[in-house]
Design a protein with these regions (language model features):
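Acidic, low-complexity terminal tails and accessory targeting/binding regions
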Residues: 11-13, 29-96, 104-107, 129-130, ...
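Active-site metal-binding loops of divalent metal-dependent hydrolases
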Residues: 21, 73, 98, 243
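Short glycine/proline- and acidic residue-enriched helix-loop micro-motifs
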Residues: 1, 192-213
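Short glycine-rich phosphate-binding loop at a beta-alpha junction
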Residues: 14-18, 135-143, 162-166, 231-240
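Active-site signature of alpha/beta-hydrolase-fold catalytic machinery across serine-
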Residues: 26-30, 153
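Generic structural signal for well-ordered alpha-helical scaffold segments
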Residues: 3-7, 125-132, 215, 219-230
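Short catalytic helix/loop segments, enriched in acidic residues and glycine
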Residues: 112-125
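Phosphate-coordination/substrate-recognition cap region in phosphate-metabolizing enzymes
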Residues: 1, 125-194
Length: 246
């Protein structure tokens, strides 16, 4: 009811909501149509910041809600949120690769092997500095160069940590869109970019992959890594991949 009342009154505005752990979880779940059964899956640290972007329809049932950031606590002087008491299991550090020239040019890369540009290497070095004091037991990366380079830069501060490359983490195959910018795609495939933005689950790019196909191959790799980490009693695992697979 809160979102239904508030959203129509504040179109194109930034709303600050300060509440409690349970209330924040409920608001996040309601905005993203997540069952209340998953409330304990959501962590809310003291003075954390969450950023939700609403599409602006004013109707929660029709909203496309983007979770821009979640449980941010870096402003509190902590690298990562504290684990809950009696936590058992694995912590995954999920990182997207640094910038490439094609990112900067808004070209669809897919599985074309583009290296990091100067800014991408600088971004990776900042991530490396941020995670320098965080204990990492094992690292996994997409086998594409931009992800591997990012991982190797991060691991410069973690000597002895093993790195495993995995094709399952490669970016979604953009098919005939690969190498093209948005203007070229719109010219060659009119209306398809808008469909991709609004209902990506219903669109398969020509000669590319569907989101369902990416989901299936990525989940299989995640499950394999989780099972291996549990069997080897690992605590923290780094994964560096792509916007689509992450």
């Amino acid at each position: 009811e809160f979102w239904q009342e508030i959203l129509p009154l504040h179109q194109n505005q930034t709303i600050l909501v300060v509440a409690h752990s349970c209330i924040n979880r409920c608001l996040i779940q309601a905005a993203n149509n997540i069952s209340p059964a998953y409330m304990q899956h959501i962590q809310q640290s003291n003075c954390c910041i969450n950023v939700l972007n609403f599409a602006g329809t004013g109707n929660l049932n029709e909203e496309k809600v983007q979770i821009e950031s979640f449980n941010q606590i870096q402003h509190m002087g902590e690298k990562l949120p504290s684990l809950r008491p009696n936590h058992r299991g694995i912590r995954l550090l999920l990182v997207r690769h640094g910038e490439t020239d094609w990112n900067q040019q808004s070209r669809y890369q897919g599985q074309i092997d583009i290296p990091l540009n100067v800014n991408g290497k600088s971004q990776s070095e900042k991530v490396a500095e941020f995670l320098k004091e965080v204990s990492i037991d094992k690292a996994f990366s997409s086998s594409l160069l931009r992800a591997r380079e990012t991982t190797e830069i991060i691991l410069q501060h973690h000597q002895g940590v093993g790195l495993e490359l995995n094709d399952g983490f490669k970016e979604i195959i953009h098919g005939l869109w690969q190498g093209k910018d948005e203007a070229e795609i719109e010219l060659e495939f009119p209306g398809e970019l808008q469909r991709w933005r609004e209902t990506p689950e219903q669109l398969k790019m020509p000669d590319g992959e569907s989101l369902e196909q990416v989901w299936q191959r990525t989940i299989a790799v995640y499950e394999s890594i989780l099972n291996s980490a549990l069997n080897n009693k690992l605590n923290t695992v780094l994964i560096v991949a792509h916007g689509g697979t992450n």
